A protein has these predicted regions:
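Short glycine-/aliphatic-rich beta-strand segments at the starts of folded cytosolic domains
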Residues: 17-36
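Interdomain "pre-motor" coupling segment immediately N-terminal to P-loop NTPase/helicase cores
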Residues: 58-120
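Compact, well-ordered interaction domains used in eukaryotic information-processing assemblies
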Residues: 47, 53-56, 62
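Conserved helicase motor core of SF1/SF2 NTP-dependent helicases
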Residues: 63, 128-138, 146-256, 260-350
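Short amphipathic alpha-helix segments
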Residues: 34-51
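Conserved adenine-nucleotide phosphate-binding loops and their immediately adjacent elements
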Residues: 118-132
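Acidic, low-complexity intrinsically disordered tails
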Residues: 1-19, 341-350
Length: 350
């Protein structure tokens, strides 16, 4: 039996009974409104915890009873306490935060022994003026650490794993800290055949449709007025891949998105633009190459050639790291399995 009060004051009481592997505890939260947000509409957050951690969670008012294996109950308790503290700080709670907290609790139990006195309290976090961005998976955690450690980082994997999002967040953090002068955004415009001169409008209008995911991240992570001003002054620069030849990019964070659609020569040209006090982040999904048949992906070749080069980070995401709606991970996994079946007897280029 235990009835502590947490340091935050969020956990009012809890009780526990244990019979071998079976455990039951009761948690009570002192703010009814926050408890309601914690449990989710119609208890959807509790339902997700039940599904992912193999426990039974029964809610009564601001109390929740957790029953199941000792490990499952302990992980569920850490998830609920962590999310409640997030709400007490005034932060918004979305379904992705719940999934991230669950993955953290699982990682604490499987990647290293959990000891409340010594365990890492959470995955890595990027603190920005507008908001904090926290890794939700072990791969994202490793990605953030790689971004801080290396001048060049490759992040590859399926859509929805946060590769581009975290790259932009890291770039914004360095920009806000004045560690770099500029953020440079680029991607190959395969759909336009890189012949951007034939498209109407100025350079930003030509490239905007191809960089929309990066723009969305910028506006979500920074004050829109600051983004617009930085675009006007060139502190945030849109640089089509085809227009980067001959430049040396210094004191900047350069992000190349959708890099799976670069050719070998384009990738080599891009990587050799790295200048003094600059960081490069290359993201892409090797399974979504839109190059003409027979054309080797510059991303696939670069990650192969540079895998053991000192000073370069490589993070590979899988379907398990998808942080969009939980169905997205299943969809990606289904497509990946289907793609493997007809591969036999066929010449598949990397």
């Amino acid at each position: 039996m235990r009835s502590p009060r947490s340091d935050s004051g969020s956990l009012v009481s809890s009780s526990a009974t244990s019979d071998n592997a079976a455990t039951q505890i009761v948690l009570a939260f002192d703010d009814n409104r926050l408890a309601s947000l914690l449990f989710g509409q119609y208890g959807q957050n509790l339902a997700l915890i039940e599904r992912r951690l193999g426990v039974v969670a029964e809610q009564r008012g601001n109390h929740v009873t957790l029953a199941g294996s000792r490990d499952g109950v302990e992980r569920s308790r850490r998830v609920l306490e962590g999310l409640y503290e997030q709400l007490r700080r005034g932060d918004e709670l979305v379904s992705g935060d719940v999934e991230g907290a669950i993955r953290l609790a699982i990682a604490q139990g499987s990647l290293f022994d959990y000891d409340p006195a010594t365990a890492r309290p959470s995955f890595e976090e990027i603190n920005l003026r507008k908001r904090a961005v926290r890794a939700r998976t072990a791969a994202q955690d490793a990605y953030i650490r790689a971004l801080r450690r290396h001048a060049l980082v490759f992040g590859t994997g399926p859509a929805g794993t946060g590769k581009t999002w975290l790259a932009v967040a890291h770039a914004v953090q360095l920009f806000e800290r004045k560690e770099v002068d500029r953020i440079i955004l680029s991607r190959p415009a395969v759909e336009a055949g890189e012949r951007l001169g034939f498209l109407p409008g100025d350079m930003r209008e030509k490239v905007d449709p191809y960089l929309r995911p990066i723009y969305d991240a910028l506006y979500d992570l920074m004050d829109p007025r600051i983004v617009e001003r930085a675009l006007q002054t060139g502190e945030i620069e849109i640089a089509p891949l085809a227009f980067m030849r001959g430049r040396t990019l210094s004191n900047a964070v350069i992000i190349l998105d959708e890099a799976q659609n670069t050719t070998t020569m384009q990738m080599k040209m891009f990587l050799t633009r790295l200048g003094e006090n600059s960081r490069m982040i290359v993201t892409g999904d090797p399974s979504q190459v839109d190059l003409p048949p027979g054309q080797t992906s510059g991303l696939a070749e670069a990650t192969r050639l540079l895998r053991n080069v000192e000073g370069i980070g490589h993070i590979v995401y899988t379907a398990e790291d998808v942080v969009r709606h939980e169905l997205v991970a299943r969809i990606v996994d289904a497509y990946d399995k289907a793609a493997l079946k007809p591969a036999r007897g066929r010449d598949i280029k990397e």
